[in-house]
Amino acid sequence: FRLCRLAHQMLADPYWPKKVKAHHEEDIAPCVGCNECLLAGFSGKHYYCAVNPLCYAEKAYALPLPNGQKRNVLVIGGGPAGMMAAITAKRRGFDVDLYEKEDKLGGTLWPAGGPDFKADVLKLIKYLETQCKKLDVNIHLNSPITKDNLEGDYDKVILAAGSTPAMPPIPGIDTTVLASDYLTHQATVGKKVVVIGAGLAGTEAACDIAGKDGDVTLVEMCPDILFTANHCLNNDQHLRKIVKDRGVKVEANAKVTNITPTSVTFERDGKTMTLECDTVLNAVGFRPNNQLEDLLDEKYDEVAVIGDAVAPRKILTAIHEGYHAIRVME
């Protein structure tokens, strides 16, 4: 059993045993239980790992050795993509400035690790932050980059500004509580909650609330929950089991037409229905923060947009794009 459990961790960091022996546990890239490795295997592909871009590609994707050439890199955004880009740049011997608008690093990993059954994701934040600090990345917190303060000479700029919760044109949408705010303990919810959106974030938030004795209903316009989620079947089945075991109710094929602070009205099959509640949680998705892209392209020769700033996706795409954006630098 222990060897089976270790197998995933060995994909995340094959040097795990050596780091443990040397008492460098803080340098171990943690398995977050996303099962991207299994998804790859079940799809007939070679195995890959969300937190390790070199998994099964140690030679193909190895970093060029530092040659003494100094390069200056600007990273905008301190989420997983930005942190991995900064770490990779320092490992290549480059100078790095990382600017993050919030007061801490981590980005959307914080809400991703918010549910009671996904705490392993928080270990990834700690690992990435530790590597940034050990490598002396020049980190600027509470420092949003805008068109008015963008300055400096950089050989490459990485736009990794992440994403922002979407606000579709539904009457009353501005009265909702963001699922990301709930999952990061910036907002509380009442006993009876309606969650709009049953993708991964909405379903996980609903399960977390239900696990705290909440009365939760998911309202989803698609035919089923997790309809567009591209994740491993194991994770899908596990999350559906939590939905069932915790008594989360589901209203699928439901188009939300109106929201108040204590109700959600939706249409289905020509009929209009209203759910009363204490709190309405908004989990309808995210949109990329890429407004600086055109300005960066005008000012700098090398610009790479990565992670959720391209489109809201997975931890895997964020980590891998952060690594490869720096790996390919000449």
Residue ranges: model-predicted function:
Residues 95-135, 184, 207-254, 310:
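Rossmann-like dinucleotide-binding cores of NAD(P)H-dependent redox enzymes
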Residues 2, 7, 155, 191, ...:
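Conserved acidic residues
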Residues 70-99, 105, 141-148, 160-170, ...:
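Rossmann-like dinucleotide/flavin-binding elements
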Residues 126-166, 257-266:
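Feature captures the FAD/FMN-dependent oxidoreductase FAD-binding
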Residues 1-76, 80, 84, 88-91, ...:
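Flavin-dependent oxidoreductase catalytic cores
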Residues 6, 142, 253:
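Short beta-strand and adjacent tight-turn residues that come in two discontinuous sequence segments
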Residues 2, 22-24, 114-118, 234-237, ...:
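Short, hinge-like loop/turn segments at secondary-structure boundaries
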Residues 65-73, 203, 254-264:
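Surface beta-strand/loop "capping" patches
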